[in-house]
């Protein structure tokens, strides 16, 4: 009996060549709607679906393959005598290949002007049903949902006259990944449309971007996946202009650097090591901002990741060229800057649209046996809600330094303390188990520069000991959430030393 293939695709990439290859192997091809029209326009002889079902395509194509003559031909177990007898009695012929991909639901809902009705109309019903039927019966049916697999199937047919069992299994697994991702997109769209923030089940889907050499350490395997609708201002959508392939740690660090530099509207440069900022500088131009970020910690910046929110010019590139860096991220690079930086063959250069998120996306964190979901911390300082409990208010320069430190501290691992002075960070204390420990690290790093600087704390001071350390170092202004039962103790210490202190009412823990 002649083998048969059913071909009905939304993505018509390579389908004409593939069907031509099937026909050359003596395989009969059944097709529907626009796919049939395309194949016939290219001189290929195919059978219309209505000839198989004995029933016309109806309801604007909503019902065309949902028929026993199709699904019987897909689901029949060929070595089951009962199935074969029933097929013969009912005139059902087997279908050996299914070539189907689904209505472009993702592309439809990505359109800015999409209506709910348009989205619903692009939910495929017949396609998923067919490929699931074929995948379930993959011992007898080869099912292809990805044009990437066309050449593999044709090569095996030409060499062996059939598709290998292992290949059929791989193709079947891809089908169920394909339909699961498709249904997840639909589920998420409808959930968002209904305004449900915490549904009883969470479905997520990500698309493979690249395999990585290894994970956080060489003994760990890793892969990079991107969200279907990730913001273009993300590492997932970065364009790499030069350098080695990104590593797992590179991606994490680049993401951290990008998150911080997005906080600034003025020219800014951020240097990151191990997902913590080691230097942040702002200025009237990007060269000045980089100089300050470098001077913030010229030791730790070595081997770091740099993110800038303005084009990298030649002068800045020449400064960057002087030290070893893993990555430089910017919205763009001048041609002269590229010529300078591309002389370092391993330096990775990424262009990314630097744009602060206007709404909080969801952050997913895996834990053993589960997943935590929360909104990203995109909250900026609201000066209308702050309070100043101390006798002295910050000066104009102190306010500038406090705001810079506050923008940075929320991106530092808790317990976090950041010192800033003259448009740059001068000390960062990260990840200590007690707040005063982080303060001591930041103060030690700042050295003499701590005199007259501003301090930001990601959470309140449970005791006045951090204030005491700040006062000894000559720090003159502090910004913190407030809210401790011992706030009065901290206020008294601040007033004793003439420190201006701001309460934001907002905590910025980061773990």
Swiss-Prot record:
Classification via SMART domains: AICARFT_IMPCHas, MGS
Keywords assigned by UniProt, alphabetized: Hydrolase, Multifunctional enzyme, Purine biosynthesis, Transferase
PROSITE patterns: MGS (PS51855)
Domain of life, source organism: Bacteria
Matching Pfam families: AICARFT_IMPCHas, MGS
A cellular-component GO term for this protein: cytosol
Keyword hit for Chaperone: no
GO molecular function, one term: IMP cyclohydrolase activity
Catalytic activity of the protein: (6R)-10-formyltetrahydrofolate + 5-amino-1-(5-phospho-beta-D-ribosyl)imidazole-4-carboxamide = 5-formamido-1-(5-phospho-D-ribosyl)imidazole-4-carboxamide + (6S)-5,6,7,8-tetrahydrofolate; IMP + H2O = 5-formamido-1-(5-phospho-D-ribosyl)imidazole-4-carboxamide
GO biological process terms on file: 'de novo' IMP biosynthetic process
Functional pathway: Purine metabolism; IMP biosynthesis via de novo pathway; 5-formamido-1-(5-phospho-D-ribosyl)imidazole-4-carboxamide from 5-amino-1-(5-phospho-D-ribosyl)imidazole-4-carboxamide (10-formyl THF route): step 1/1; Purine metabolism; IMP biosynthesis via de novo pathway; IMP from 5-formamido-1-(5-phospho-D-ribosyl)imidazole-4-carboxamide: step 1/1
InterPro entries assigned to the protein according to its UniProt record, in alphabetical order: AICAR_Tfase_dup_dom_sf, Cytidine_deaminase-like, MGS-like_dom, MGS-like_dom_sf, PurH-like
Ranges for domain MGS-like: 1-145
EC numbers for this chain: 2.1.2.3, 3.5.4.10
Free-text comment on this protein's domains from its UniProt entry: The IMP cyclohydrolase activity resides in the N-terminal region.
Family indicated by similarity: Belongs to the PurH family.
Protein name per its UniProtKB record: Bifunctional purine biosynthesis protein PurH
Taxonomic source organism: Bacillus cereus (strain B4264)
Gene: purH
